[in-house]
């Protein structure tokens, strides 16, 4: 991926349970009618218009791509990409040589604020 200009963020946004009802992959017939969460559309489209990169990163499988794209279009989401196949249920631990930032969704989209947090890191022997 390209180097982003200063100030531009690359947002990876989950779908189920984050921007709409939490629908398991085993119930795809419910996906097209998933209820949109308040402020999700407004906030994400605002970030898009501000020049940030919006990538939906979902645990839905490739079999669900078409219904997911239709749902996003139906609701008017602006985005750059859609990645399928994220590990389910938070069952992942990201390891990277670059800083990774995460924001837990707590039921409402708002502007982001800064907070100090305790994190786990590899022991590099430089305590």
Segments predicted by a language model, with ranges:
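HAD-like aspartate-dependent phosphatase fold
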Residues: 1-127
